[in-house]
Every structure is written in structure tokens, then in C-alpha cells.
């Protein structure tokens, strides 16, 4: 088992279709010479189990052996959501279904010219893990993989969810619908209790219940969103358990998109929940997609530091090169993160370290050679040669891992001057309330508060509503919905001496999305 470096600093490297095999040895040598000490690779089920029970590990074995040779540690990103084509045929009844009845096809990814992906987002594939046969097949893949690489001198651990998210529009297939009904039984107990909560009075059997296909601020929609979160985080735990059963010593990591403020309700991007399940958490933050305003350089690290609740966290995907031909860059100046410079890489890296990140990976060691993201993000050039950008990254890697920086890298940011409350229920209800109008009220309020403090040199921490004890001053943006226990928690905190600065309409809506007949609710 490999040892964790002082500061894991490296890149995502192997995705089966890229980079070319003839360059692997040279690339590893270059990376090691430049001070890079960690690679993450995509171990795609669809590329490895080529027929039932017939695994092709050759290319993956080579990655770990090269890593051991050159002193680089390896994070295996398990991509069990990339479904083998034979499994799509064999388990056709388990294909995920969109809200309009269309089934998910098996496609190639924009980030890998390899089959088995789906349109359904970062955490789910063509088939649902709610189907027992699919889950058993995925578990067999995970178990076989973990047993194979257990104890390898280059193995550091496993990334069990890439960019923790899923599609807002799935899954309406029979296995997930059945799981939803079971979830409702556990929550409500009887059909009568569910009928009162949902205002649907003609359910004769549990099988009459179908998940909602609209996004509206009603109890059934809130329940559907919550079920999907519970369901996918249970699937995350399933992957963790499968790997740990085969290799208890492997490090377990995951990374999201710092998306709790913008994507929690619809895509399940709950950084707090994801971080709670792993030893080290991380985040993807690409300035070419997000923008390079000063406050944005710190936002993701600050949010994930709060979500990590004291655990180590990494900037797991940091931009190292240009981006073009993508919707996020339209209408933006090329200097707005689109064409990364060495100085950009220095700024982005040091901002993340200042925010508390203690590991860093470029999301490409070198650019892809095919697909819509060809040529994007790599610090090294299309052939894997050094560039001024890679030289800058190398200098940061060496600096961060120098012995004289050991104490610095053990340090952490001080507690902020003020905490910004993150309330998942408020975010979820705001998403449903504003969906048809296409308003981004919640994220605008949260970002506005953070930016206001940042621009006035006030350090603001992100604080989950469950974590307010121990804070002195809190700011609560757009607190439109609260559960009774949350309202009681905040009330007791204020009575105990806490200072709360609260925007309008705190808890205006309560359980089930129902407005109070008097306010404050």
C-alpha cells in the first residue's frame, strides 16, 4: 500500500482511450521529474469486463506498475456506472427511464471515447443499481478489482463517486419506482397518512403511487427529491462497502463539484453528505466554466472546507489548460479563464491551498485527442511535452512538498468572522418554487452574501444548519423553508447568545411546502 504524500499533487491520467499507449512510460517519467506524485485513473466497468466474468486488466495493471516504478501513487476512480454493453442487453428491464418514458441509451462520454456511459450524470449509468441483478454484477466487478490491487505498492485508494451528482430527470423505471414506494412506506406507514400529506385521496394500493414528473412546490415533489438523494447516497455506501470488504486498508475518497448551493436539490450535489462517507473529500472547480472573479477563486475551497467538517480535502480537478467550443465560454473574454496562463495556474492553486485544500490534481495531465473536449485542460501539450503551464504546476508541486512547507501544510484557515447558513430544505423548496420561472433565487442569494463579505474583507465560512453550535455570528440568506426542529435549533441558539442576521421570510414555508397561516411561521 502506498504512503500518502505530504501534499498529493498530480493529475487525472488514464481513461482507456487516452493517452496513447506508446507515451505512457515517458509521461510517467516526466511527471515524476516534475514533482507530481499522484495520478487518478478511470477504471471503467464497460472497458474491463468485456464479457460476463471475462476481465481485461492489462492496461490498468500497467498504470499501477509504472506508478510504482516512478514513485507515483494511484487513486483508482471506480466507474461502475459505465455499463458493459452485454449488461445492457442482459438486464434490459433495468435500464433507467426518463420522466417522459424514454430509456437511457448507452453512449460515449465527452470525457472518454469509451462506451457504457449515459446521459444521467456523474453518479448513475444506463442501468439502475436498484435492480438486484445489476447490483450483484457491479459488486462482482468492484470486488474483483479491489482484490486484484489490494496491497499493490502504488495503490493509495479508491474514488467512489466522480463529481457526486445525478440527473434531475431519472429514474422512472420499475426498480426505482418500487424503491420509492418502499421509502414512502417507511416514512408514512399508511396510505391514509400519505394521502393527507400529498393531498391525493384515491390511492387504493401502494402500487398506485407513481413518482411526480413535474417540478412544483408540493409535498410529493419534495419527497421525490429527498428519496433520490437517499437512494443515490445509499448506492455510494454500497460501493464503499464492496471495496472495503475486499480491501479494508485502501483509502476511500470522493469528489463533488462544490454544488450544494446550486445543485443539491435537483442533482444531489450534497457536499456535506458526500464528505461524511469518505476519508478525504474533494471538488472539481474549473475556472473556464465558472469564471475568474476573485471571490470565485475562493468560494469552492471555502464551501468544501465547511462540508468536510475538519477532514482533509483536495482540489480534485483543477484546470491546467484552455477550453473552447463549450457553452460556458460563449461571450466571455479569453482572459476569463478560457486560455489558462502560468499565472492563472499559480493563482488558482495557491487560492485553493489558502482555503485549506491539501491535495491538488489537474483534471488532465495532457489533453484528450478526441471527443468534444479534445485539447482541453491539460498542463502538458497534446503530445505530452512540457509547457510553461506545466512548468508552473511543477514548481508548485515541488514547493508544496518541500520539507520546509510541512508545518504550513498542516495548518488550516482560522474560523471565519461570520458563518453563512446552508439549509438543504430551503434550497430544495426554492428550486421547486422557482423552477417554472427559471429563477436562481437561492443560489443568487447565497453567492451574493458570500461575495458581499468577501469584497469587504470579511471571512465567511459555510455552515450547515446542523452545525451552528459553536458559532458566534451567523447570516441566513433566503431562509424560505425550515423544518420545526431546525427552527427550534436556531431559536435556542439565539437565546443562548448567538447573533443571527436573517433575511426576509424565515421559515415562511414549513413541512410539506405549506405556508404558515401566520408569520413568523
Predicted feature locations:
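Catalytic domains of carbohydrate-active enzymes, especially glycoside hydrolases
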Residues: 23-44, 59-66, 70-81, 276-281, ...
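Short, acidic/polar
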Residues: 18-33, 138-144, 262-275, 340-351, ...
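Polysaccharide-binding and catalytic clefts of secreted carbohydrate-active enzymes
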Residues: 100-297
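Carbohydrate-binding surfaces of carbohydrate-active enzymes
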Residues: 290-299, 303-521
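Short, well-ordered coil/turn segments that N-cap beta-strands
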Residues: 4-9, 35-37, 68-74, 151-156, ...
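Aromatic-lined substrate-binding rim segments of carbohydrate-active enzymes
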Residues: 24-112, 116, 135-149, 233-247, ...
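An acidic-aromatic substrate-binding cleft motif
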Residues: 1-24, 28-38
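The substrate-binding groove and active-site-proximal loops of carbohydrate-active enzymes
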Residues: 9-20, 42-58, 118-139, 163-169, ...
Amino acid at each position: 500500500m502506498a504512503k500518502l504524500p505530504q501534499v498529493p499533487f498530480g493529475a487525472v491520467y488514464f481513461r482507456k482511450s487516452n493517452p496513447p499507449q506508446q507515451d505512457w512510460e515517458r509521461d510517467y517519467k516526466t511527471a515524476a521529474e516534475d514533482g507530481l506524485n499522484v495520478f487518478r485513473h478511470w477504471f471503467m466497468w464497460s472497458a474491463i469486463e468485456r464479457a460476463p466474468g471475462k476481465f481485461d486488466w492489462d492496461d490498468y495493471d500497467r498504470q499501477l506498475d509504472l506508478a510504482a516504478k516512478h514513485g507515483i501513487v494511484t487513486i483508482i476512480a471506480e466507474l461502475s456506472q459505465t455499463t458493459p454493453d452485454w449488461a445492457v442487453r442482459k438486464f434490459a428491464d433495468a435500464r433507467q427511464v426518463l420522466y417522459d418514458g424514454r430509456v437511457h441509451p448507452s453512449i460515449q462520454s465527452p470525457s472518454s471515447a469509451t462506451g457504457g456511459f449515459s446521459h444521467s450524470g456523474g453518479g448513475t449509468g444506463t442501468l439502475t443499481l436498484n435492480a438486484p441483478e445489476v447490483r450483484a454484477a457491479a459488486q462482482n466487478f468492484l470486488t474483483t478489482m479491489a482484490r486484484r490491487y489490494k496491497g499493490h505498492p502504488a495503490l493509495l485508494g479508491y474514488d467512489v463517486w466522480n463529481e457526486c451528482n445525478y440527473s434531475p430527470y431519472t429514474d422512472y423505471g420499475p426498480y426505482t419506482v418500487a424503491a420509492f414506494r418502499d421509502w414512502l412506506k417507511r416514512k408514512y406507514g399508511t396510505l391514509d397518512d400519505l394521502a393527507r400529506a400529498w393531498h391525493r385521496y384515491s390511492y387504493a394500493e401502494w402500487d398506485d403511487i407513481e413518482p411526480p414528473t413535474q417540478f412544483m412546490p408540493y409535498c410529493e415533489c419534495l419527497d421525490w427529491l429527498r428519496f433520490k438523494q437517499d437512494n443515490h447516497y445509499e448506492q455510494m455506501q454500497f460501493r464503499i462497502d464492496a471495496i472495503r470488504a475486499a480491501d479494508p486498508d485502501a483509502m476511500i475518497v470522493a469528489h463533488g463539484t462544490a454544488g450544494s448551493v446550486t445543485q443539491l436539490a435537483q442533482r444531489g450535489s450534497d457536499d456535506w453528505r458526500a464528505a461524511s462517507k469518505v476519508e478525504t473529500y474533494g471538488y472539481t472547480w474549473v475556472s473556464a466554466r465558472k469564471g475568474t472573479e476573485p471571490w470565485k477563486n475562493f468560494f469552492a475551497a471555502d464551501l468544501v472546507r465547511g462540508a468536510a467538517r475538519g477532514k482533509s480535502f483536495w482540489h480534485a480537478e483543477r484546470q491546467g489548460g484552455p477550453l473552447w467550443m463549450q457553452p460556458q465560454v460563449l461571450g466571455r473574454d479569453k482572459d476569463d479563464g478560457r486560455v489558462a496562463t502560468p499565472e492563472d495556474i499559480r493563482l488558482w492553486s495557491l487560492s485553493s491551498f489558502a482555503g485549506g485544500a491539501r491535495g491538488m490534481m489537474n483534471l488532465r495531465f495532457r489533453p484528450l485527442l478526441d471527443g468534444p473536449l479534445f485539447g482541453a485542460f491539460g498542463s502538458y501539450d497534446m503530445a505530452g511535452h512540457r509547457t510553461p503551464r506545466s512548468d508552473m504546476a511543477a514548481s508548485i508541486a515541488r514547493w508544496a512538498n518541500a520539507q520546509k512547507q510541512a508545518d504550513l501544510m498542516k495548518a488550516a484557515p482560522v474560523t471565519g468572522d461570520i458563518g453563512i447558513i446552508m439549509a438543504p430544505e430551503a434550497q430544495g423548496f426554492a428550486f421547486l418554487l422557482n423552477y417554472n420561472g427559471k429563477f436562481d433565487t437561492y443560489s443568487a442569494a447565497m453567492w451574493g452574501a458570500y461575495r458581499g463579505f468577501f469584497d469587504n474583507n470579511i471571512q465567511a465560512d459555510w455552515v450547515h444548519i446542523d452545525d451552528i453550535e459553536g458559532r458566534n455570528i451567523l447570516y441566513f440568506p433566503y431562509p424560505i423553508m425550515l423544518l420545526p426542529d431546525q427552527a427550534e435549533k436556531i431559536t435556542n441558539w439565539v437565546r443562548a447568545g448567538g447573533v443571527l442576521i436573517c433575511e426576509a421570510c424565515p421559515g415562511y414555508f414549513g413541512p410539506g411546502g405549506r405556508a404558515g397561516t401566520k408569520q413568523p411561521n
